[in-house]
Amino acid sequence: MERIFDEELKALKGRILALGGLVEEQVQRSIKALVERDSDLARGTIEEDHRVNRMEVEIDEECVRLIALRQPAAGDLRFLTTAMKIVTDLERMGDLAVDTCERALELNEEPPLKPYIDIPRMADAAQRMLKEALDAFVNRDAELARKVCRDDDFVDDLNKQVFRELVSFMVEDPHTITRAIRISFISKYLERVADHATNIAEMVVYMVEGRIIRHMVP
């Protein structure tokens, strides 16, 4: 019975990684749709969101089934409750990719305001944080999880930098206000993606060490 449970947990990890990979791809596609002004890609990415939602529900149901059926001890129980929280964060990241695509569709109907430089940097950093947070989860690596928490400051700083630059555009030319606000939304969405990756990392520390580090300096 224990061997069967171990196999079930291994399969669950694989499904969570698959969902994480899909979400990472959704974020990447949303930024590509923005930078390359590809509205077809934006619409296609929005249509793919149902896969993220379906996988989130299926994984959540599997976690509940395993808790009820296997009645896991402390360590495995923390793993399963952490997994349930992680897939919720992943689903919300998918929603943020959809939000980004919706703003991209609006921006693609207007002349470009400026070249996108910091937005792709934010996206790269947020995707890296997500990948490392999931690696930390699978490998039970609390130190890597703490690194993800620290990396969140970089994305926060970029978001502030983008906002300051956009304010300058709006002050100098009121005609840019609508476009600048839409870009600022996208910057905020990416900051929130990084925040969700940080949430996952914090939960990994709890899973591994039984310590809650939210609102603490890692």
Predicted ranges, named:
Residues 1-218:
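Cytosolic, long alpha-helical scaffolding segments
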